[in-house]
Amino acid sequence: MNFDVAIIGGGLAGLTCGIALQQRGKRCVIINNGQAAIDFASGSLDLLSRMPSTTYGENRAVENLKENITALRNELPAHPYSLLGAEKVLAKAQDFERLANELHLDLIGSTEKNHWRVTGLGSLRGAWLSPNSVPTVQGNELFPHKRIAVLGIEGYHDFQPQLLAANLVLNPQFEYCEVTSGFLNIPQLDELRKNAREFRSVNISQLLEHKLAFKDLVKEIIESSQGAEAVFLPACFGLENQEFMTALRDATKLALFELPTLPPSLLGMRQRIQLRHKFESLGGLMINGDSALNATFEGNKVRCINTRLLEDEEITADNFVLASGSFFSKGLISEFDKIYEPVFESDIIGVEGFNQKDRFTWTVHRFAHPQPYQSAGVAINAQCQVKKCGQFLTNLYAVGNVIGGFNALELGCGSGVAVVTALAVADEILAK
């Protein structure tokens, strides 16, 4: 099978790159092994939330994105943002904002500055873009609603309203609020309660999607809110989009917000579903449940790849994009004595002091500190071309968290790196 571009990985980076290429006439295939990290994510995207701890002791929260992305180059020269340059990073981030608006992902935020989003535990985390159904505040501004009811679902343990309510008022933006907590009694969920493993956000959403006893649910929310102006609910209402949540908001006449629960996350799954629908509607091909095994090279180019399900049939393409993610998605593999990228056997880099073949450099003794192994990934140049055996391959690009040289967990930049590198690589391929 021959394509213009073959993309390995169907997460946020792979789908974003595929959509950008399909929109401009390229014929793409995405080889997708299964669920991606986006299915377990909060639904909020971070461009850069914190600066490295090496200089500032504790990680300093980022508010002004342009200023800090520029300063990041001095701290982490191998970070994808440092290689691309602040101007291109911000331009690609703004391109994604336009794409998200076009796809009706219902995201709010901008590259001007970060905002705070409320987490499922009641703390605040910096974010670049968040679903408009998630409660957010800008800087030190007070939350606009004084009386808040935090409502869980009886028997659902992946969302704890009492804990959230107690933590929420510890934040200066919410300390003036009157916050109560309670539980919704939804009889339609009794069948799910018989098996705790099935009582998850996805199962709840699928059952409620049919709007069974919708009026009863509306009545239960109104009564449980006890006169509150705003209601915080677990993200269990609406699997593919916000239509169900919007219907509830209109029917209750309340300011309803939803918060991410323990994974799987409906907020992240909605985004992946909408991105995938867009990619396929543009004519892109998704090969699901398959994984790339190895590649064949000709000089400094990739000629073809083989996959697990199509082992006897080569997939050839003019260009290849590695969007396989990090350890979670098996884009990187860790063995006792080495960390490696399994498909192309690309060169691996990390933060200063990290050595992929020296296990003692992978961790630091303090468990809660940033761990060097979290920065492992493939080496790239300013065009996001992948390095192998000391040379950059001309038609192999890397996007997203398979790239090394930075710790996405420490810096809060994983989804930003994913979309920025994806759109930058699309431009590189289209410019050929």
Swiss-Prot record:
Cofactor requirements of the protein: FMN
Alphabetized Pfam families for the sequence: FAD_binding_2
Gene3D superfamilies: FAD/NAD(P)-binding domain
Gene Ontology molecular function terms on file: glycerol-3-phosphate dehydrogenase (quinone) activity
Reaction equation(s) it catalyzes: a quinone + sn-glycerol 3-phosphate = dihydroxyacetone phosphate + a quinol
Enzyme type, top EC level: oxidoreductase
A GO biological process held by the record: glycerol catabolic process
SUPFAM superfamilies the UniProt entry points to: FAD/NAD(P)-binding domain
Similarity comment text for this entry: Belongs to the anaerobic G-3-P dehydrogenase subunit B family.
Known partners and oligomeric status: Composed of a catalytic GlpA/B dimer and of membrane bound GlpC.
The name this protein goes by in its record: Anaerobic glycerol-3-phosphate dehydrogenase subunit B
